[in-house]
A protein has these predicted regions:
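Lipid interaction determinants
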Residues: 1-113
Length: 113
């Protein structure tokens, strides 16, 4: 069993940024954890990156590769903000069905595919 096993098998939907602002309706931002990887939607573009955890609660996300669809307005701003925060992630916490990535305190709720 690896430290990130509890994150796998679910689609994590971003529900709130660190400042409490919600994600734009109709433009879901998602994260799916697989062995050594994270992928999902930034709201406009699909992305993937390496992801590793040396111990429970620790997280390292590598450089993000994403499709290059044009993304204007609030959706584009949210996507850029999400990608920047995701690349800086150093830890995670699971509590009552919610995933929080930090620093940056992005909060996700899980759905099963």
């Amino acid at each position: 069993m690896t430290p990130m096993d509890a994150l796998k098998g679910k689609t994590w939907n971003l529900v709130q940024f660190d400042d409490g602002s919600p994600v734009q309706a109709g433009r879901p931002i998602t994260a799916v954890f697989e062995e050594g990887r994270i992928s999902g939607s930034g709201g406009c573009n699909r992305y993937s990156a390496s992801a590793a955890s040396a111990s429970p609660g620790a997280l390292h996300v590598g450089a993000i590769s994403a499709t290059k669809m044009a993304c204007m307005g609030p959706a584009g701003t949210n996507e850029q903000r999400y990608f920047a925060a995701l690349e800086k992630a150093e830890g995670y916490a699971l509590e009552e069905g919610k995933l929080t990535l930090s620093p940056g305190k992005m909060t996700f709720k899980a759905t099963t595919p």
